Structure formats: structure tokens, C-alpha cells
């Protein structure tokens, strides 16, 4: 391998939005994540709705007329 062309690899703490920290190796200096294994519904067994910026409501408003027409027909 050629010298002095590879990024520096070091240990960092990845911080989740729930506050959980995981130590891992990366070329980045810091890492922030929204969901980790401590708060993800698959790993916790708890169902929780994660709706960023009202996407579900926007979808329902956009397609409400379409679904009403199919129900009437």
C-alpha cells in the first residue's frame, strides 16, 4: 500500500438520540444516529411510531380523495 494516502482510523463514540453511546472505529471524528439497538422497536419489542415532519398526515391528505372515490365506486 502507498503511504500517506489513507485516512486516519480511530475509535469514536456514536451517540444515539436516546442517549445511548456505542464505541466503534471510524475515519469520522464524531457520529450521531437517530435510532440504535437500544431504542429500535425490533430489538426492544415495543412498537413506537416515528413520524418525522408529519409525513403520514401529508400522505393521508394527498390521497384522501383518491381513496374516497374508490370506496364510493
From Swiss-Prot:
GO BP annotations, alphabetical order: translation
Pfam families to which the protein is assigned, alphabetical: Ribosomal_L31 (PF01197)
UniProt keyword Heme present: no
InterPro entries: Ribosomal_bL28/bL31-like_sf, Ribosomal_bL31, Ribosomal_bL31_A, Ribosomal_bL31_sf
Classification via SUPFAM superfamilies: L28p-like (SSF143800)
GO CC terms of this entry: ribonucleoprotein complex; ribosome
Keywords, alphabetical: Metal-binding, Ribonucleoprotein, Ribosomal protein, RNA-binding, rRNA-binding, Zinc
CC cofactor: Zn(2+)
Ribosomal protein listed as a keyword: yes
One Gene Ontology term of the molecular function aspect: rRNA binding
Positions with a binding annotation for Zn(2+): 16, 18, 36, 39
Cofactor note: Binds 1 zinc ion per subunit.
Gene3D superfamilies per record: Ribosomal protein L31
Subunit-level organization: Part of the 50S ribosomal subunit.
Protein purpose: Binds the 23S rRNA.
Family per similarity comment: Belongs to the bacterial ribosomal protein bL31 family. Type A subfamily.
Full protein name: Large ribosomal subunit protein bL31
GN (gene name): rpmE
Amino acid at each position: 500500500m502507498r503511504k500517506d494516502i489513507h485516512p486516519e482510523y480511530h475509535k469514536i463514540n456514536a451517540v444515539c438520540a436516546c442517549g445511548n453511546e456505542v464505541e466503534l472505529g471510524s475515519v469520522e471524528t464524531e457520529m450521531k444516529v437517530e435510532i440504535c439497538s437500544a431504542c429500535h422497536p425490533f430489538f426492544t419489542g415495543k412498537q413506537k411510531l416515528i413520524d418525522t415532519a408529519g409525513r403520514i398526515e401529508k400522505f393521508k391528505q394527498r390521497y384522501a380523495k383518491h381513496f374516497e372515490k374508490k370506496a364510493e365506486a
